[in-house]
Amino acid sequence: MARVTVEDCVDKVENRFELVLLAGHRARQISQGAPITVDRDNDKNPVVALREIADETLSPDDLKEDLIHSLQKHVEVDEPEAAPAQIANAAEEIAEGIAEAGEEDVVTFDRMSEEELLAGIEGLVAPEKNDGF
């Protein structure tokens, strides 16, 4: 990798670590068949990616955004937020629904004393040992 190329890129992308991430991402894009925007001149993909960044044929901000999207497992979709009045109305409807449900939907849990718990634990059988695990 030519030092001149790296020095030219540092002017465009201040952080060297970010530069490495962006150039690596762009080099992977090139290896997957993305069209290059500069002459190859028998250079390898990372050098071509750095030359593209140095020549500003690609925007570092666009590359950064594309890198972020490629690393996300779940891409968020910006949806318009509900107005505060709609949220208040929905909260009131939920509260009314809970009040109407009343005592019928109350969930009860069985209680167990400490002695009953210990007796239950003592009654458990240990699993057989297996050589595979």
Swiss-Prot record:
Instruction: Note the superkingdom of the native organism.
Output: Bacteria
GO BP terms: namely: DNA-templated transcription
Query: Which E.C. number(s) belong to this protein?
Result: 2.7.7.6
Tell me if Membrane is a UniProt keyword of this record.
no
Recorded GO molecular functions are: DNA binding; DNA-directed RNA polymerase activity
SUPFAM superfamilies on file? RPB6/omega subunit-like (SSF63562)
Which reactions appear under catalytic activity for this entry?
Answer: RNA(n) + a ribonucleoside 5'-triphosphate = RNA(n+1) + diphosphate
Q: Can you cite an annotated GO cellular component? A: DNA-directed RNA polymerase complex
Q: Which family does it belong to?
A: Belongs to the RNA polymerase subunit omega family.
Q: Does the keyword Transferase apply?
A: yes
| Listed PANTHER family | DNA-DIRECTED RNA POLYMERASE SUBUNIT OMEGA
The record lists the organism as Brucella abortus (strain 2308)
Query: Which keywords appear in this protein's UniProt record, sorted alphabetically?
Result: DNA-directed RNA polymerase, Nucleotidyltransferase, Transcription, Transferase
Query: What's the protein here called?
Result: DNA-directed RNA polymerase subunit omega
Q: Which Pfam families match?
A: RNA_pol_Rpb6
Q: How does it assemble?
A: The RNAP catalytic core consists of 2 alpha, 1 beta, 1 beta' and 1 omega subunit. When a sigma factor is associated with the core the holoenzyme is formed, which can initiate transcription.
Task: Name the HAMAP family on file.
Answer: RNApol_bact_RpoZ
Q: What does this protein do?
A: Promotes RNA polymerase assembly. Latches the N- and C-terminal regions of the beta' subunit thereby facilitating its interaction with the beta and alpha subunits.
